[in-house]
A protein has these predicted regions:
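Short, surface-exposed connector motifs at secondary-structure boundaries
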Residues: 59-62, 84-86
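Glycine-rich phosphate-binding loops at beta-strand->alpha-helix junctions
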Residues: 67-76
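Conserved beta-strand segments that form the floor/walls of ligand-binding pockets within enzyme
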Residues: 23, 67, 90
Length: 117
């Protein structure tokens, strides 16, 4: 991941970081037959990503949201979004069904409201 981030973000200036978002989606979790990552695994990878971003950009890296994608659905969204290093969700197939997407959004909003209060 570190190498991918360093190569992918080479040339990005610190003053442009407010427009940069990173989404992590394990290849084995993509698609209809994808296996969702556990919340613990996703959290560990997000910590690694944030560490790499800090190595590249220093304290300015805190401006970069890191999202998780990869078979996100209403059944696992809440366990992912409560993780401290996951800043948001990158939703694919679950957004195809309006009811599922609505449930997912409501669950995420509930978690964010609990963080703020």
């Amino acid at each position: 991941l570190r190498t991918q981030l360093k190569v992918g973000l080479s040339g990005v200036k610190k003053e442009d970081l407010g427009r940069v978002w990173v989404a992590y989606e394990p290849v084995w979790s993509i698609g209809v037959n994808g296996t969702p990552a556990s919340a613990d695994y996703a959290e560990a990878m997000h910590k690694e990503i944030k560490t790499a971003l800090y190595e590249i950009f220093g304290e300015k890296a805190e401006e970069i949201p890191v999202l998780y994608g990869g078979s996100v659905n209403p059944g696992n969204a809440e366990s992912l979004i409560v993780q401290p290093s996951i800043d948001g969700l990158f939703v694919g197939r679950a957004a195809w069904d309006a009811d599922k997407f609505n449930t997912l959004i409501r669950d995420a909003l509930k978690v964010y409201a609990e963080r703020v209060c």
